[in-house]
């Protein structure tokens, strides 16, 4: 059975500006509140470690979603596309639409 991670945030491009990477203490505190330890790939902002963690966990594909978020940090469609193009056998992208700006997305 193939495992797909539907919420992966690789440490690349603008994703590094999101709260997950830019505010490591917040990320680590939140992760521990959920009873888990922060992923070494997130702590070290390491793409090779992320790929190893995915492989070790049996994850065959990761889904990256674009989003517009002032509080948590935005992930652009261009960044999602570039990451998926660089790792076509690993990542799949999903567009994100900001509901107040939905007409601009058409």
Tell me what each language-model feature is.
Residues 1-106:
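Helix-coil boundary/capping segments in enzymes
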């Amino acid at each position: 059975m193939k495992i797909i991670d539907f919420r992966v945030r690789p440490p690349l491009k603008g994703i590094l500006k999101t709260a997950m990477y830019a505010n490591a203490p917040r990320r680590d505190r939140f992760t521990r509140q959920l009873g888990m330890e922060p992923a070494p790939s997130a702590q070290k902002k390491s793409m090779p470690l992320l790929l190893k963690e995915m492989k070790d966990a049996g994850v065959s594909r990761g889904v990256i979603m674009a989003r517009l978020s002032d509080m948590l940090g935005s992930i652009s469609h261009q960044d999602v596309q570039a990451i998926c193009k660089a790792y076509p056998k690993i990542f799949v992208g999903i567009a994100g639409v900001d509901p107040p700006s939905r007409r601009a997305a058409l």
